[in-house]
């Protein structure tokens, strides 16, 4: 776990969520000193924001796909 001000750009949603869950467990169980807990909390905020961004991107992509799927062209046969 790195406590940088930014996350690695290539961290997946699943990896970020797993790390966030581990941080929450450690803080809830009081397994860390106050200073370490504060650093973990800061990292947790970065992870939460990253997860929210990934979810928003996925939602927008799904909406775009759905719009494309719903706007298919239907050809009707006409008599000539």
Swiss-Prot record:
The keyword Cytoplasm applies. It is an enzyme of class 3 (hydrolase). Keywords: Cytoplasm, Exonuclease, Hydrolase, Nuclease. The keyword Cell wall biogenesis/degradation does not apply. InterPro entries: Exonuc_VII_S, Exonuc_VII_ssu_sf. Its main location: cytoplasm. Its EC number is 3.1.11.6. Bidirectionally degrades single-stranded DNA into large acid-insoluble oligonucleotides, which are then degraded further into small acid-soluble oligonucleotides. Heterooligomer composed of large and small subunits. Belongs to the XseB family. HAMAP family: Exonuc_7_S (MF_00337). This is Exodeoxyribonuclease 7 small subunit.
